[in-house]
Amino acid sequence: LAEQKIIAEKLDTLLAQVDSTKARFEQIPQILKRFRQAVLGGAVNGKLTEKWRNFEPQHSVFKKLNFESILTELRNALSSKPNESGVGHPILRISSVRAGHVDQNDIRFLECSESELNRHKLQDGDLLFTRYNGSLEFVGVCGLLKKLQHQNLLYPDKLIRARLTKDALPEYIEIFFSSPSARNAMMNCVKTTSGQKGISGKDIKSQVVLLPPVKEQAEIVRRVEQLFAYADTIEKQVNNALARVNNLTQSILAKAFRGELTAQWRAENPDLISGENSAAALLEKIKAERAASGGKKASRKKS
């Protein structure tokens, strides 16, 4: 009984520590999300490269431009229905594009003519915007196609492809349209039709872009990638730690059942384990008293 009490106390203490640790770890992804948003915000308002500009021989200025002025092309896609059977050319799904990312493994297939293929096939450096989506948070998001994985890769009609002039790096423009201020501006253009939320090519062209010189764009891209890689490393470490914490509860309970939580206590209290004060001795004493009590009752009945 004494050992059971010690086990219960240790379990309460250890499991409370596990819950507290888990709660702190679970807050970190949200903190990292805010960190990434702050990085994107600083990237497009000049704060991220503010000190860097002090060492530049020429004064760097962020120009306010309509997106249309740095476009060589903004093209809607084919409206033909894709298939799942693998016939034709690979085509992205609308879900392939998320803010700052294009998943080239999220594909279906589409049969089209040679001329349609030439007009709509993608290449490295293409920017893709989601034109329609059932979820507001995914409307107007921008992803950059990097390291093309499929030959003759196409995009569906709910995406819009953008190609840029030499004045703008596609990596910087992806960062810009993923920033909180640009996302808010894009949201102001969203309209709902038949349950689908969407924007038009005209809406995208009219977006105001803050554009520094190409050299500073490259520095912004480098710093954002560096800071995001740092955040990704932390997130991976946190996820690994959370997985271990989630296994701790079962591990602690298993140790409790095996008596490992109270090994030191048993070493310090041998009399409660095997002496006259132990649980085993107490049980034997109770059995003896019950036997004696039963014997007396039986003898009285015979007389």
Q: For each of these PLM feature ranges, what is it?
A:
Residues 1-2, 150-160, 168-171, 186, ...:
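A short glycine-rich beta-alpha junction/loop motif
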Residues 6-54, 236-267:
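Short amphipathic coiled-coil heptad-repeat segments
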